[in-house]
Amino acid sequence: MSRIQSTFAALAAQGKKGLIPFMTAGDPDPARTVEFMHALAKGGADVIELGVPFSDPMADGPVIQQSSERALAKGVSLRHVLADVKRFRESDDKTPVVLMGYANPIERMGADAFAAAAKDAGVDGVLVVDYPPEESANFAETMKAAGIDPIFLLAPTSTDERIAEVGKIASGYVYYVSLKGVTGAANLDVLSIAGKIPAIKSRVPLPVGVGFGIRDAQSARAVAEVSDAVVIGSRIVQLLEEAAPQSAAGKLTNFIKEIRQALDSIGATAG
């Protein structure tokens, strides 16, 4: 069982919801990425999604696009991100880490070389935004052979055929994009999310994490009521951008603690 699978199994056994924060590797300060990853884990993150900076992040809204640009301007590459994960693993062998990014940096390295390097670094999952599932069976197998979960996106516009395709090749969890648009958008529709999850669950035997548009404890709790996990990205990137350097890690931990408490209150209020 992979680290991601055992994390979700433990959450399910406790009746808890998963909390998956996203941050861009190298932003705001490449020297502090590992420190911020530990701050997320300390706050109660179940899985950490680490964004690999890319020059044309088409699925991302302005907050994460600009974050990616800042990291690239500081020279952060896929190899730097893998080195950060390896350093994180020196003192945390429990929290799963998922790399989220685009195909180009992986293809430049080569899928086999990337799988080997990611395994060596202690990466648990990979989500390549621009790999459609119907063209990704070989990539998924290469990742699985290295013990890495290939994670895929589904959206409100995903057909039953695409959902079934993801069900065949994905592992770990699936990431449901709750809005038609880009990350960080504001209009969250929990009813439409609740309406789509059963169609995914019937075809994909994996936990469903929902992201895009979750900004605070209230929206996180509302989405977690109808899903297995919530993914929060733009708000975290914004928080790190705005915080004074000396208080950034503490603010990050406190923000994650707030979300964690909101998720853990689901079901608790019934008694």
Swiss-Prot record:
A UniProt-annotated Pfam family: Trp_syntA
Active site annotation, chain numbering: E49 (proton acceptor), D60 (proton acceptor)
Cellular component annotations (GO), alphabetically ordered: cytosol
tRNA processing among keywords: no
Keywords assigned by UniProt, alphabetized: Amino-acid biosynthesis, Aromatic amino acid biosynthesis, Lyase, Tryptophan biosynthesis
Main enzyme class: lyase
InterPro entries xrefs: Aldolase_TIM (IPR013785), RibuloseP-bd_barrel (IPR011060), Trp_synthase_alpha_AS (IPR018204), Trp_synthase_suA (IPR002028)
Pathway listed: Amino-acid biosynthesis; L-tryptophan biosynthesis; L-tryptophan from chorismate: step 5/5
Protein EC: 4.2.1.20
Molecular-function annotations in GO: tryptophan synthase activity
Catalytic activity: (1S,2R)-1-C-(indol-3-yl)glycerol 3-phosphate + L-serine = D-glyceraldehyde 3-phosphate + L-tryptophan + H2O
NCBIfam families hit by this protein: trpA
Family: Belongs to the TrpA family.
Subunit annotation: Tetramer of two alpha and two beta chains.
Role according to the record: The alpha subunit is responsible for the aldol cleavage of indoleglycerol phosphate to indole and glyceraldehyde 3-phosphate.
UniProt-recorded name of the protein: Tryptophan synthase alpha chain
Species assigned in the record: Paraburkholderia phymatum (strain DSM 17167 / CIP 108236 / LMG 21445 / STM815)
Source species taxonomy: Bacteria, Pseudomonadati, Pseudomonadota, Betaproteobacteria, Burkholderiales
